[in-house]
């Protein structure tokens, strides 16, 4: 039997241990593929098919039959009910959906669940304008382990660029640091440079500024590159470990 499953709710926390008081290490979003390593009545231990991330989620809200045809390319896509009225639920950026039927403005993704047609792209679409994606998350609150509009951490905002484009990239900063190819250390930064510290990462949006999910500011924010490097060194005694760049 094939061990391939897909998450079918907007999002869920992934826990380090099978307990809601355990550390939240990441999240799983709608349409994300995973394998089940073990399970009991309440919990399943999963391994993400995208990045091999391992953790625990509640033993519910998943299926083995899901063939994604499109994906969400806005920060959050409001879900409409069968009467075409808005609900309080949203699909997060990069959710992978199957289209059941289409009308003039909406697409049905599950029976009685619709989202706006203009909010999706085909599953094989490659988004090259990574700055527009990064800026979707501006002012999103910082949450350790988060990777959606409800909250996001520094490594997730970088990984989502690759996840959307169906390209492998690790989840945690320590693994991203090892995986990323190093550029020559320099003081002249450019758009697309990725700056790594121990436990933190930021992306340059031009020669002078960067964007990152920054814990001390509790949100995704644009800051001066040089100021950020100075603040991090002064407050944490951490220096830049590697400069890489975004490569699709």
Regions found by a protein language model. Give the residues of each.
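Loop/turn positions that initiate beta-strands
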Residues: 31, 92-97, 189-192
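A short macromolecule-binding patch
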Residues: 51-62, 110-123, 222
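Active-site nucleophilic cysteine motif
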Residues: 134, 146-165
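SH3-family beta-barrel domains
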Residues: 1-18, 27-28, 37-40, 47-50, ...
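...with weaker cross-activation on analogous glycine-rich loops/strands in unrelated enzymes
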Residues: 167-226
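Short, solvent-exposed loop/turn positions at domain surfaces
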Residues: 22, 84-85, 183
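Extended acidic/polar, glycine-enriched regions
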Residues: 44, 89-120
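A short mid-domain helix/strand-loop element embedded in enzyme catalytic domains
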Residues: 114-142, 164-165
């Amino acid at each position: 039997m094939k061990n391939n499953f897909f998450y079918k709710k907007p999002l869920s926390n992934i826990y380090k241990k099978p307990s809601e008081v355990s550390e939240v290490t990441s999240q799983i979003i709608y349409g994300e593929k995973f394998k089940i390593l073990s399970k009991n009545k309440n919990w399943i231990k999963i391994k993400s098919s995208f990045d091999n991330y391992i953790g625990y989620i509640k033993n519910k809200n998943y299926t083995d039959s899901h063939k994604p045809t499109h994906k969400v390319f806005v920060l959050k896509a409001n879900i409409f009910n069968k009467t075409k009225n808005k609900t309080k639920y949203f699909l997060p950026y990069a959710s992978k959906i199957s289209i059941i039927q289409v009308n003039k403005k909406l697409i049905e993704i599950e029976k009685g669940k619709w989202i706006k047609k203009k909010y999706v792209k085909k599953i094989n679409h490659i988004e090259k304008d990574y700055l527009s994606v990064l800026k979707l998350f501006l002012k999103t609150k910082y949450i350790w382990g988060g990777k959606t509009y409800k909250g996001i951490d520094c490594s997730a905002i970088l990984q989502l660029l690759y996840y959307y484009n169906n390209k492998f990239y690790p989840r945690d900063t320590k693994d991203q640091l090892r995986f990323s190819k190093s550029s020559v250390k320099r003081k002249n930064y450019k758009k697309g440079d990725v700056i790594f510290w121990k436990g933190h990462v930021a992306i340059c949006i031009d020669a002078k500024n960067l964007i990152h999910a920054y814990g001390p500011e509790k949100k995704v924010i644009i800051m001066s590159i040089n100021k950020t490097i100075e603040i991090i060194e002064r407050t944490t005694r951490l220096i830049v470990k590697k400069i890489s760049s975004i490569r699709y």
